[in-house]
Amino acid sequence: MRPLRIGVSTYSFWHFKGEPVDIAHCIDRAAEMGFDGVEILHQQMGGEDNAYLQDLKRRAFTQGLDLMGFSTHQGFVSPDKAVRQKNIDHTLRCIDIAWRLGIPTLRVNTGRWNTIKSFDELMANKGIEPRLEGYADDEGFKWIIDSLEQCIPRARECGVTMGLENHWGLGRTAEGVMRIVDAIDSPWLRVTLDTGNFLEDMYEQMQRLAPHAVLVQAKTYFGGGEWYSLEIDYDRVNKILRDAKFRGYVSLEFEGKEDAATGVPKSLAVLRHTLAG
């Protein structure tokens, strides 16, 4: 079996601190470091106009890189229908952007209750937060399912598969992610598996999601993690992915405090070694 292809998220070069690192610069660095592709973080982009998008696509192509993932944020867990509609509209726009960039998959999130406002505090609490008073998780799941169902026709039209990530909120666990994916039951909504977002029973939960994954995000923490560090056995992750017959891209999300100039190449070396076959 061929080695898995390895890309890098532009998030690896910018952890939401200071001015966003230019996407074009990230593409150039990815090529220099020897990656196969690039996953673009939407919040890091310098614009959405077509000239900007096509320049990024041209740049990646001339560097021999695939633009293989588009990482976006959603917040469907709200009793306010207007808030949910705003997030639906945002997702539809992001599907269009991915299509214009030639990117085949879009990372989507469930959103969360937002009863803990600070992300740092949320991470200190292991991603767990109280429900909004007067509401139950069942209602939150219904909002997410109803919202993502409205995005399926656009995803199908554009040929962009949404990948629901295990990314806090009601998608914090494999059970929560699969509750949504199974309910919608569409080939245009699958899973983005993040190896660093399961803080309990990580390998068992990865096994649950791996057969449904269209993209895997691989966390590393050289220099210590920005919020926490996990000891992830990537030989074991590789076996999970192989057993699930996963053949897609693995996207590095370097989340360590070490400078990206050294932390990212170190991470690539680990992934090249462990995911070789």
Can you say where each PLM-predicted feature lies in the sequence?
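Conserved beta-strand edge residues that scaffold enzyme active sites
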Residues: Q44-M45, Q74, R112-W113, G169-L170, ...
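Aromatic- and glycine-enriched glycan-recognition loops and surfaces
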Residues: P20-A24, Q44-L53, Q85-K86
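Histidine-acidic metal/acid-base catalytic patches
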Residues: M1-G34, G102-T105, I145, E149, ...
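A short acidic, helix-capping loop that chelates divalent metal ions and anchors anionic groups
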Residues: G75-D80, N114-K117, E200, F222-E226
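A short beta-strand-loop structural module common to alpha/beta enzyme folds
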Residues: D36-M45
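Active-site acidic/histidine proton-transfer and metal-coordination neighborhood
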Residues: Q54, R59-D66, S78-R190
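Conserved beta-strand positions in the central sheet of alpha/beta enzyme cores
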Residues: E39, G69-S71, R107, G163, ...
